[in-house]
Design a protein with these regions (language model features):
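Hydrophobic core of transmembrane alpha-helices in multi-pass small-molecule transporters
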Residues: 107, 118-136
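Helix-loop boundary and gating motifs at the non-cytosolic
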Residues: 6-73, 123
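Juxtamembrane intracellular "pre-TM" segments in multi-pass secondary transporters
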Residues: 4-17, 221-251
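C-terminal membrane-cytosol helix-exit motif in multi-pass small-molecule transporters
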Residues: 171-184, 206-226
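C-terminal ends and interior cores of transmembrane alpha-helices
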Residues: 98-117
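Glycine-rich segments within core transmembrane alpha-helices of 12-TM secondary carriers
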Residues: 157-179
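Cytoplasmic helix-loop-helix junction between adjacent transmembrane helices
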Residues: 131-162
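Cytoplasmic membrane-interface "Motif A"-like loop-to-helix N-cap segments
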Residues: 87-103
């Protein structure tokens, strides 16, 4: 309706800043979990042996996590065009973005339980966190042309990048301090205390991601398409997703 068009005029500074602020919320995942802490924590699980049996196969620990990571990107390549086709059609990018933010955040928290006894559950949380992080970015980035004029897009992206850099470094420093001085945070003053602090750092990432993304969700417009039920029946939602998938693979 013209009413909604008037409210969501492109270039609203508050909306643009709220969009950029999502980088502050999510950048803690690739830095703290992806790069700094999780690889070290994962290594501590395999002090006795580098090999583990999964589904009857003997895996080297590094190969195992690489296989799971590859599977995530394989699925993303197939599912993301499908999901963004559906989101474009229904006009509910925000719902998709929220879904992956919540799924990703809770999966980060779930990494607290990642150990050799719970290896399947741990790998599932690792998988879901990585998948959700990248999937949320797809919907996040597709918002930009809807809310920013072409001339503003570079600046808003750069603002997001700087928010993300500062936010993730703050949380990383806090977690590194906790891991290196576990006794100051109520953990044992030992290697075991540091390992426990690493697990708690996964909880902090999940909490940070979910907490700070609320500001973004509050200000981002829903951009609902006014899709009548008749139109929905005429145009299959799934077909819209598949068309997009095919066009992406043709490139």
């Amino acid at each position: 309706s013209s009413m909604t068009k008037r409210i969501f005029k492109k270039g609203n500074i508050k909306v643009l800043k709220a969009w950029a602020f999502y980088d502050w919320a999510n950048s803690v995942y690739p830095l703290v979990i992806g790069t700094a802490v999780f690889p070290i924590y994962y290594g501590t699980l395999f002090v006795d042996s580098d090999y583990i049996e999964i589904l009857g196969f003997n895996y080297k620990n590094t190969a195992l996590i690489q296989h799971v990571t590859s599977l995530v990107f394989l699925l993303l390549a197939f599912l993301v065009p499908l999901m963004s086709g559906i989101a474009d059609f229904l006009g509910n990018k925000k719902s998709f973005m929220k879904l992956f933010v919540y799924l990703g955040s809770f999966s980060c928290m779930g990494l607290y339980f990642f150990d050799l006894e719970n290896i399947y559950l741990g790998l599932l949380f690792y998988f879901l966190a990585l998948f959700s992080f990248w999937a949320s970015l797809v919907f996040y980035n597709s918002y930009l042309p809807d809310i920013a004029n072409p001339t503003e897009q570079d600046n808003v992206s750069a603002l997001g990048f700087s928010y993300g850099y500062v936010g993730s470094v703050i949380l990383l420093l806090f977690n590194l301090f906790m891991i290196n001085f576990p006794a100051s945070f109520g953990f044992e003053d030992s290697n075991q205390g540091s390992v426990e602090a690493m697990k708690v750092s996964f909880l902090t990432v999940g909490f940070w991601w979910i907490f700070f993304s609320q500001y973004t969700f509050h200000h981002l417009p829903s951009l609902k398409n006014n899709v009548s039920e008749k139109e929905l029946l005429k145009k299959s939602i799934l077909f819209s997703g598949f068309k997009k998938l095919i066009s992406v693979w043709r490139l």
